[in-house]
Amino acid sequence: QLRGGTGIFTGNIPFVWFTNMPTNAGVIQNTFEPVSSSVLAKIDHFEADPNFWPNALPENFPKTPSTKAPGGLALIDPDFKMPQIWRSNFGVDFKVPSTPLVLTGDVIYSKDLNGVMQYNVNRNPATQKLAYSGDNRDYWGSSANAKFNKNTSLNNIVPLLTNTDEGYSLSATIGANINNVRGFSAGVFYSYTESKDITGNPGSSASSAWSNNYSVNDPNESLIGLSQYAVPNRVGGNLSYRVEYAGFLATTIGLY
């Protein structure tokens, strides 16, 4: 028996990476929690007009920054696309003649079409390299022209949510199983996986998804490497026993 298929699949991302942008937009934002009895006394009715309370309580809703605009920014590439992969699979099952044994094999290949990654647009390239034996990593000096940030009035990390198409994975599985031989069923399988990507986006926010990436010099290198979620070699098995009784009842005990 042969089986297989191919297709393009689209998914979602953690939506916090979208909400990072409006909440870190570099404009004045204010969270107001009334605790003073004098302020609470003024809030005596519901008002649908969103501009009413900021105008009625100007001391609690500042309209101009006291020093400078907030330094936190999170950006989204105007051409950003939701994650999309091309995936193909092929499988074969072969029943060994005159035995209950079935041999099976499967191959799955996936290729990123629109992978998701974060890029720090406020990162200056390094100006120097270490000169130790076997260690030539980049580093940032202490001179005025060797600043880590392009714009020092902003935070160290200004993440840009964008796409990459460099990731892929290949998984192959072989196995053998028997089904319901005097109530017994069993199987054993081996899987090999090679999976590489630019990033696994290991963070709950845009900045942590960038800064938590493993890298030699800095996460902006965007070098393809082994996926942190890949399991290269895996062996699995199962064993179960089914007993029928009372004409219409059955109990199965399984071990995986």
Where are the regions a protein language model picked out?
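Solvent-exposed loop/turn elements at secondary-structure boundaries
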Residues: 1-160
